[in-house]
UniProtKB/Swiss-Prot annotation:
Entry coiled-coil feature ranges: none
Family as reported in the entry's similarity comment: To H.brasiliensis latex allergen Hev b 5.
Amino acid composition bias (Low complexity), ranges on this chain: 25-36, 53-65, 120-156
Biased composition (Acidic residues): 72-92
Organism lineage string: Eukaryota, Viridiplantae, Streptophyta, Embryophyta, Tracheophyta
Region (Disordered): 1-184
Domain of life: Eukaryota
Compositionally skewed regions (Basic and acidic residues) per UniProt: 96-119, 159-168
Protein name (record): Fruit protein pKIWI501
Length: 184
C-alpha cells in the first residue's frame, strides 16, 4: 500500500501585507465618500458693534487675575484640585449603597449584581409555557362539526339517491349518535 503525505496549502503573502489585510475586503474611505459642503454665497461676519466690546473686555480679564494676591490664587488652585477628588467618591458610595440594598432585599439588583444574588441561583425553574392553562376555549375539529350539506361522492362515482326527509340524511352522515326524537 502506498503512503500519501498531506501538507497544508500555503499562500504567499507580499512582504509588506499581513494576513488581516489580505482577508478583509476593501472598504471605501469615509473621507473620500463625503463631498465637501458648498461655500456660502456671502461670508458671515459679526457686526462691528458686538465685536468691539468683546475685544475690549478680553484684555481686562488677565489683568484682573494678575492683580490678585498670590495666596488667593493658590487657594483657588487647591479648590480646583479638591473638586475632582470628591466626584469619584459619590459614584462609589452610591454603588456601595445599592449593593447593600440589594443584599438586604430592599431593591431589585441590576446588571452584574443580579447574577450574583442567591435568588438568581437558588430560584426554581419556571413551569414550561405548555403547562400553563389558557383562557381560550379549544376549537372543535372540522370533522366533528355536523354539516347540512350532503357528502360529496368520490370522483367517478354516481351520487346515491336517498329516500326520506333531508333531516334524516344529515343525521345518517353525521358522526354523532343520532338523537331519537320520539322520546321527547
Amino acid at each position: 500500500m502506498a503512503t500519501v503525505e498531506v501538507t497544508p496549502a500555503v499562500t504567499a503573502l507580499p512582504e509588506n501585507e499581513t494576513a488581516d489585510e489580505v482577508t478583509k475586503p476593501q472598504e471605501p474611505q469615509p473621507e473620500a465618500a463625503v463631498a465637501a459642503p458648498p461655500a456660502p454665497a456671502e461670508p458671515v461676519t459679526e457686526e462691528p458693534e458686538k465685536a468691539a466690546p468683546e475685544a475690549v473686555e478680553a484684555p481686562e480679564e488677565p489683568a484682573a487675575t494678575d492683580a490678585k494676591d498670590p495666596a488667593e490664587v493658590a487657594e483657588a488652585e487647591e479648590e480646583v484640585v479638591e473638586e475632582p477628588q470628591e466626584v469619584p467618591e459619590e459614584p462609589v458610595a452610591e454603588a456601595a449603597a445599592k449593593e447593600v440594598e440589594a443584599t438586604e432585599g430592599k431593591a431589585e439588583p441590576t446588571g452584574e449584581m443580579k447574577d450574583k444574588t442567591p435568588e438568581a441561583t437558588d430560584a426554581p425553574e419556571a413551569p414550561a409555557a405548555a403547562e400553563e392553562p389558557t383562557d381560550a376555549p379549544e376549537a372543535p375539529a372540522v370533522a366533528e362539526e355536523p354539516t347540512n350539506a350532503p357528502e360529496a361522492p368520490a370522483v367517478g362515482e354516481e351520487p346515491e339517491a336517498k329516500e326520506g326527509k333531508p333531516d334524516e340524511a344529515v343525521e345518517e352522515a353525521s358522526t354523532e349518535v343520532p338523537v331519537d326524537k320520539t322520546e321527547e
